[in-house]
Amino acid sequence: MKIRSLFSIMALSFGVSSVQAINYSPDNVSAELLLKVPGNDAVHHSLKFEKIQNSEYDYQLVGNKKLPLMLYQNIEGSDNCKRITMLVVALEDVYFNYGQLVKTASRHDDCLFYMPGFWYRRNLRSPKEAPSFHTSDSWIVREDRLSTPLTAIYDEKSGKSFSVVRIDEFDSDALTTHKEGEVILSGKTSIGYTGFENKDGISALSFGYPYREAPKTYISKLTLAPSVEAYQFLKKGESITLTWEVSERNVNDFSECVKQIWEYSYDLYKPEPVNTPYSDEKMKEVLSNFFVESYVDDTPTKYYSGVELRTATCENLDVAEVGFVGRTLLNAFNALEYGESQNRKDLVDNANSIFDSYLQNGFSSRGFFNEVVHFKRNFVETNLSIRRQSEGVYAVLYYLNYEKQHGRKHPEWEKRLKTMLDAFLKLQNPDGSFPRKFKDDFSLVDKSGGSTPSATLPLVMGYKYFKDKRYLEAAKRSVGYLEKELISKADYFSSTLDANCEDKEASLYASTAAYYLALATKGQERAHYAELAKKAAYFALSWYYTWDVPFAKGQMLGDIGLKTRGWGNVSVENNHIDVFIFDFADVLHWLSKEFNEPRFTAFSEVISSSMRQLLPHEGHLCGITKKGFYPEVVQHTNWDYGKNGKGYYNDIFAPGWVVASLWELLSPGRAENFLK
């Protein structure tokens, strides 16, 4: 068994500059070897670095007594970027776990921490049931939790950041019989661990192979379990080569730390588009079956059943949801536009029935959308959200604009939307934010402003459609809030509604909101909003995978060949990947042109190609019962939303928003065309 480095051993220094060199010396680096005999507790061995001569390696790592492994380490690179190569050779059959620690010289209390797609700052926006400083100030996690297998430590006082990234082929994983404690792997894994530790008040980068997780392992939604250590078997005479890169940078703030690390990660991994057989036209043809089989017409408001479905049956349920995970109205617009272009009368008729029925029966007494309705229980959700309301208005504005272009007018819909947009003006706080949740009478349920950017989009669109400058001014105030409280503080949180934590959608929505305002303004204003869109975009991009997570044999996603590059982690609380993208691909293309940044367009192509892979159709249903019902909760690491674990989906899913997201990805230029 031999794991080779993905890249040749060479000095790399992407985006690295510093006055001081990394102190990668035996005095500042510690290493340990854990050895396990099945049926016995593991034994820990502290290792010493002994300089060796006339060898391709710089050091041999030795213990206080003879070990069943020979360990060699080579260090290459510049002062600020060190490539560390480990050779592990088995002298006898052995089960082992290797770990290393590099101190940074920064006080732990002065530092913020970054593990892409999983850890931002100190994760203090997350509940104590998820990984955060609420539980511990030191965390190590398995690499497949992260969109890049990397940890960075940012010292706010010195302006320095330190990072470690793993470099490998990542071609295998292995099952275990237990999820906690000392576990022996059933085969070969490529997955190691990475993280940060507080060592006597000093921050340290921690990394090793195979994986460990401490002080807890995050195994399910809001479920922390005891720590885990995995042990890799090496047969006598076999060897493994392991490679990491440790870097140091000067940065101005946490935002620049994330930006530089994303550029560095992209340049290091060089993700390429995934080769799939699905053109835009084929994708839409298959996805359109969702509009057919999910349509429900025996209720006061017609809708597409896209919430709380079971993957095993995909049978329609009684839940209608305007936005968020249902996205009924956006799907109705997509079905109408596609149906007319393809002469699909069934799609057109159903879509029009949805809009007509919502106009008649889809509103509360105060003029807000009935955003979630359970018909069999005769239950209407009374806690309203700015996100669902905004996404409903957004969809109807696209519908009205499309209808107007085709000579069809809907004055009652226009009246309804103006009432709603005026209500948004009333809801908006003096600081420009919008409450996350509220009642029909405008009383507040959740006053936090994390969902504010979702309101910016329909306000900008409403300004353009109704030519009412009040909506544009409200949109500007909302982005003023985003700039002050989210973007400048690098604190993106609570955009999604099924979790309250650091999440991808907050930064994605913030970037998109600034993009919409840039499209609607000119001169210095436009340039300012473009800069904000770019700054937030790096945080959004940090959630998307630059690498392909390995799966074990027998894990369905691996067996069907899923490549994870281009898929996005969801949030700290929900540690799975999904296809949430909507028109963010357009944002990336636009930013690429505005700032001459080819990485944005190139990675957008990776996202677009990769998110086609699990298209369910005859002979390739990917674990979903019905054609076109694209999967939602894609579990790529040792975590689940409630069922099934790595390599599978949760048993409950919401294809409604998934189809809507992919459809917008496949319909480029919508916002620019609407706002021009």
Located regions from the model:
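Active-site lining segments of carbohydrate-active enzymes
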Residues: 378-380, 398-469, 484, 538-544
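Sec-dependent N-terminal signal peptides
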Residues: 3-15
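Beta-strand/loop-rich accessory regions of lumenal/periplasmic or secreted enzymes
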Residues: 24, 38-40, 58-64, 70-236
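Well-ordered alpha-helical scaffold segments within catalytic/enzyme domains
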Residues: 329-345, 391-409, 454-468, 509-525, ...
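Low-complexity, Ser/Thr/Pro/Gly-enriched N-terminal "stalk/linker" regions
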Residues: 25-52, 234, 252-321, 353, ...
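Extended, well-ordered alpha-helical scaffold segments
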Residues: 257-293, 343-361, 405-425, 467-484, ...
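Glycine- and aromatic-rich loop/turn segments at beta-sheet edges
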Residues: 288-320, 360-381, 424-444, 483-501, ...
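Short Pro-Gly-centered flexible turn/kink motifs
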Residues: 231-255
